[in-house]
Amino acid sequence: MRIAIASGKGGTGKTTLATNLAWTVASNGRTAAYLDCDVEEPNGHLFLKPRIERDEPIHRLIPVVDPALCTHCGLCSKTCRYGAIACVGRQTLVFTELCHACGGCMLVCPVDAIREEPKPIGRLRIGASGPVRFIDGTLDVGEAMSPPAIR
């Protein structure tokens, strides 16, 4: 069974309910995991006080244009629905804050001038609090895209 506690409103008690539910389920001999997907301000750790076993970076793939190969044809710019890549004169600019990491620009480039490189955007912590498995993620300050960290 999977139970998700979600709401768009802050301060409604989601974390209190979710941490207590996970603890109660695990205390009754069932397998329970607490996943704090509020990557902008996770605070389940304040209630569960987990022992962190792993702490690793979260990455998002961003396009990097090789200026030596780029012909400035503009296909990448026309393909990007988010305006994250633009051809201006003899330059191809990448706006990483707008990029959704779909890889479309890389796929349409006729000269393979675009590759993807990982960019760190936050941290993933994995551990346990007694019988409860614990996972949370934290987005770096200034990062605008939370879905890659939640995945």
Q: Can you name each region flagged by the protein language model?
A:
Residues 16, 39, 71, 75, ...:
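Conserved active-site and cofactor/substrate-binding residues in soluble primary-metabolism enzymes
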Residues 87, 116-117:
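Short beta-strand "wing" residues that participate in macromolecule-binding interfaces
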